[in-house]
Amino acid sequence: YIIIGGGCAGLSLAYELEIHNKLKNKTLAIIEPRLEYKKDKTWSFWKTTDHNFGDCIKKSWQNFSINIPNKTNYLECINYPYQSIDSGLYYEKINGKLNQNKNVSFFKNLKEINSNNSFIFNSVPSIKKDYDNLWQHFCGVEIETQNDFFDDEIFNIMDFDCEQRESVHFFYTL
């Protein structure tokens, strides 16, 4: 097997192949340009089904809020909690498991792949230059306060009570 892209999707696939014994008597090449895996992001999502990464969850919420100018709406999400996974814990778990299999290898800066007798998974998105793409960007900052300022039992998914500057802006507070 060959997995192009060793980010969240590629590593998740490799992990599932490994824990379900699909790599027995097989080789797996993961092509990823990064030099090292370290905490570089947080993945957050609504938990709609069980997953294998409960031990990587940094925080889980069953309550959230949405702010608009002069109003805050509070909602519950008991059946579908919102979870945040720490990428450092995720990388440590997956790479720890994959490194136990001598038939799994990571490669960087490959210019060419011999795909004979290989099944290739490409997790790198192709972006068409002639197509109008819609992007959603998040810039994250972790802050610490001397006093309790945030209620850690509720997260604010969208706070629109800020300058909009002719486009949509909001704060997202976990």
Q: Residue spans of the language-model regions?
A:
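Conserved beta-strand termini and adjacent loop/short-helix elements that scaffold enzyme active sites
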Residues: 31-33, 69, 76-78, 107-109, ...
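Predominantly flavin-linked oxidoreductase catalytic cores and closely associated redox partners
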Residues: 6, 16, 20, 97-174
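Short, surface-exposed, polar/charged, turn-prone segments marking secondary-structure boundaries
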Residues: 55-60, 93-96, 146-150
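Short active-site-adjacent helix-start/loop capping segments
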Residues: 38-39, 74-76, 114-115, 129-130
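Beta1/beta-strand and adjacent pyrophosphate-binding region of the FAD-binding site
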Residues: 1-9, 29-31
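Short beta-strand to alpha-helix junction loop
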Residues: 74-96, 123-124
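N-terminal FAD cofactor-binding segment of flavoenzymes
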Residues: 12-71, 88-89, 139, 143
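Residue-level preference for alpha-helix termini and adjacent loops
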Residues: 44-45, 60, 74, 81-84, ...
